Every structure is written in C-alpha cells, then in structure tokens.
From Swiss-Prot:
Record bears the keyword Cell membrane: no
Source organism (scientific name): Janthinobacterium sp. (strain Marseille)
Cofactor note: Binds 1 divalent metal cation per subunit. Can use ions such as Zn(2+), Mg(2+) or Co(2+).
Amino acids binding a divalent metal cation: H175, H220, H275
The protein's name: 4-hydroxythreonine-4-phosphate dehydrogenase
Record Pfam families: PdxA (PF04166)
Protein keywords: Cobalt, Cytoplasm, Magnesium, Metal-binding, NAD, NADP, Oxidoreductase, Pyridoxine biosynthesis, Zinc
Family to which the UniProt record says this protein belongs: Belongs to the PdxA family.
Catalytic activity: 4-(phosphooxy)-L-threonine + NAD(+) = 3-amino-2-oxopropyl phosphate + CO2 + NADH
Function statement: Catalyzes the NAD(P)-dependent oxidation of 4-(phosphooxy)-L-threonine (HTP) into 2-amino-3-oxo-4-(phosphooxy)butyric acid which spontaneously decarboxylates to form 3-amino-2-oxopropyl phosphate (AHAP).
The protein's annotated pathway: Cofactor biosynthesis; pyridoxine 5'-phosphate biosynthesis; pyridoxine 5'-phosphate from D-erythrose 4-phosphate: step 4/5
C-alpha cells in the first residue's frame, strides 16, 4: 500500500488472548499498517517483550493525541495509546475491576475514528460478563458502538478471504432466539438492512454495483406459501422495491442450495435471515479466518470471529492463533482504502 492506513486496535479483555493476538498481528503487518494499540502501555509492553524482544512499542498519552493527533513513527514500531488498568492482570482469570477499563479502550477507539485519528477500528475479544459485573449493562461490541455513535440500525456481517473468492454474509437478525426470528423480520427492518448493505458495499468495499443474494426464511424458501408466507409477504416485496431502484438483489433462495459456488461466484454478498442459517457455512469455509464486520456505523469496525479463550491465555503465550486478527486487520485496511477512494 502506498499509504499505510492507521488502524486502532482495542486490546480487549486483558486476561484473555486479546493483548497477545493484537500485538502479534500488529507486528506482522507493520510494513503495511500503522497500528495503534489501545490499552495499558506497561502491560502491553511487558506482553510484547515476552512474545518477542524485538517488538518495539511507543507509548502515547491520550491527551497528546487529542492535542496533536497521532504522530508519525517508523515501520518498526507499534504505537500504544495508554489507558491504565484498574487491577493487576492474571492470565485466564477475570476481574470485574477491569470491566470499565475495557469500555474505556473502546471509547478511545470510537473517539479517534470519529475525530479522524484512525481510518478503522479493529476490536479484540472482550468478556461481556466482566463488564456487566462491573455494574455496566452491556450486550456486546455491536450494540455499544451503535449506541455511542447514535446509529439507529446496524448490520452484522461475517466475511473471509480464505475462500476461492471473498465470501461475505450479512444477517437480517443476529443473537435472537429462533422462535422470535420471523416476527423480527418486517418490511421496514429488512428494507433498512438492505439499504445499509448496499451503501456499505459501495462506500466501504468499493463495489460500484453490489450483487446480493437473499436467502428465504423457511425451508425451500416457503414452497410457494405452503411452508410459510414470509417470503411472499415480506422478503419479495422488499427485493422488488430495491430492484425497481436498479439494484442487483436476487431471491429469496432456499438457503440449503444458495451457498453453492455457481451462485456465489456471481455475487458480492449473501443476506441470511438468521444467525445459524448463514454463519455455519462461512465458519466452515474460512478455516478459522472469519472476520466480524459491523455495517451501518459512521466508521469502519472489524473484529475477530472468536472469544477471549481464557483457557489458552492461562496456558501461557504462544497457544493462541492470531490468524483471525490478521484477517480483521487486512480487511479493515482494504475497507479504509476503499472508503478513501469513494469519498
């Protein structure tokens, strides 16, 4: 890349694998990405030294960045915006005292993206229970980012470049009980989701004319109404409205046949109706290299597709695979480049 994108990495739950995989990925991609870790500078420096003594971290104060922006630094350095821990970290052992610390790192990432310090945010995994135990109601990264940026509707996408061509799967619903899915899919909600997908595929992925395949909700896409009428009464009218505006959206297709190469090679994204309809295929195909992307935000955010892995953290450094973090950073960099071009 001619210009290294500046990417902030929130280091996640300090007792998990987030700090390690963040440092490893940032160091590996230092030639192509200007990485800014957000977390406790002393703790991250200690972790980096244990991973590889050659890794060089450069600490920045938040106030200095607010005053002057992110300074230039060499390609053999990783910057850290210091955000002090509340309590000593024991790998693999959660401490609610550090719950608010995790949110502070997110707040800095959001502030920096909105102020133009960063081109994108990549989030390492956090532990929801620790934040809730700290007295802060918290349901997840996505909801927190939406709330902090005053975004009414967001779309969860999983993506991977580990397949013959990029595979992107957007979700019409996310972490919702299966019995509640049908009621959650309305004409208004689905139209909004499709609008976000189309806009972000254009503006954040650089796809001028996105091609979207849409899955049905019911087996066999409803079998003409015999197995459910959501395809007839909700999904098809939304697709027809988008098609009337000139967009290439197709469906609804039976989900059990949609994920075939002959269909995917002629598409930029699949829209699945619920979590376990679309994600098993992607997770199987991605070989652990899936990336979680939040669309609809006024910033670029990607994340790993796994959790804090406290057991691996407790076992010591070198146990965790940082492949998903590498892909999250690469896709964030690609999106940042596309966003610069489209703006």
């Amino acid at each position: 890349m001619s210009k290294r994108p500046t990417i902030a990495i929130t280091s996640g739950e300090p007792a998990g694998i987030g700090p390690e995989i963040s440092i490893r990925a940032a160091w590996e991609l230092r030639a192509d990405v200007k990485s800014i870790l957000i977390g406790d500078a002393a703790f991250l420096a200690m972790t980096a030294a244990a991973i590889n003594p050659a890794i060089r971290l450069s600490a920045l104060s938040l106030q200095a960045v607010r005053n002057s922006g992110v300074p230039d630094f060499s390609r053999d350095q990783i910057a850290v915006i210091d955000c002090p821990l509340a309590a000593h970290v024991v790998p693999g052992k959660l401490d609610a005292q550090n719950g608010r610390y995790v949110l502070q790192t997110l707040d800095i990432g959001i502030e920096g993206a909105q102020q133009g310090w960063f081109d994108a945010i990549v989030t390492a995994p956090l532990q929801k229970s620790t934040i809730n135990d700290a007295g802060v109601p918290f349901t997840g990264h996505t909801e927190y980012l939406a709330d902090k940026t005053n975004t009414a509707q967001v779309v969860m996408m999983l993506a991977t470049n580990a397949t013959p061509q990029p595979l992107r799967v957007g979700l019409a619903t996310t972490h919702l009980a299966l019995k509640d899915v049908a009621a959650a899919i309305t004409i208004d909600s689905l139209a909004g989701i499709l609008d976000i997908l189309l806009a972000d595929l254009q503006n954040k992925f650089g796809i001028a004319k996105p091609r979207i395949l849409v899955a049905g909700l019911n087996p066999h896409a409803g079998e003409g109404g015999y197995l459910g009428r959501e395809e007839i009464e909700v999904i098809t009218p939304v697709l027809q409205a988008a098609q009337a505006k000139g967009f290439d959206v197709r469906g609804p297709y039976p989900a059990d046949t949609l994920f075939q190469q002959k269909y995917l090679e002629d598409a930029d994204c699949v829209l699945a109706m619920y979590h376990d309809q679309g994600l098993p295929v992607l997770k199987y195909a991605s070989f652990g290299l899936g990336v979680n992307i939040t669309l609809g935000l006024p910033l670029i955010r990607t994340s790993v597709d796994h959790g804090t892995a406290l057991d691996l953290a407790a076992a010591g450094l070198g146990q965790a695979d940082h492949g998903s973090m590498l892909e999250a950073m690469r896709i964030a960099a690609q999106m940042a480049a596309a966003a610069r071009t489209s703006s």
